Design a protein with these regions (language model features):
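Short acidic, glycine/proline-rich loop/turn micro-motifs
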Residues: 25-30, 70-73
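An active-site-proximal "capping" alpha-helix that borders the catalytic cofactor pocket
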Residues: 37-49
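Active-site metal-coordination segments of metallo-dependent hydrolases
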Residues: 30-38
Length: 141
């Protein structure tokens, strides 16, 4: 779930806003956005493109949660429909797998390191996926 924060029709740019803590903002400035953030903004761009918008670029503005406006940073790249399509294909595969095998198949599916803390299904330490998701397992192969 999410919504497009900003679309600049003149430049064809979809922009997402993120409010980050000091550590996350420092990492964003050094390494750019996470794969999850990048994919998210490309998905938003795909939605706009399907509704008729002329999308050419995506961008993320990272704002400091506790700092000043001057601490904000902006990242951008060309719109990549393939990135969004790969995400949608993975979602379809997950739906098919759980449709055939049930939700008990979820622990068998590799996860990506993500921002689980903000997910409504995240419950650290849960062992029954019928109840919730324990989040990314860094030890899983």
């Amino acid at each position: 779930r999410g919504t497009v924060d900003l679309y600049d029709a003149k430049t064809g740019t979809v922009i997402d806003h993120k409010v980050l803590g000091a550590t996350s903002l420092k990492k964003f400035k050094a390494d750019g956005p996470s794969e999850q953030y990048r994919t998210q903004v490309h998905l938003y761009a795909t939605g706009l493109r399907l509704s008729g918008a002329n999308v050419r670029h995506v961008g993320i503005v990272a704002w400091s949660r506790s700092g000043q406006l001057k601490d904000a940073t902006y990242w951008t790249e060309p719109y990549d429909e393939d990135r969004a399509e790969q995400c949608l294909q993975r979602l379809d595969a997950l739906k098919q797998t759980t449709g055939l095998l049930g939700r008990g198949a979820l622990p068998l599916i590799p996860t990506a390191d993500a921002h689980c803390t903000y997910c409504p299904f995240y419950l650290p330490g849960v062992t029954d996926v019928e109840d919730a998701c324990a989040g990314h397992d860094k030890e899983a192969k």
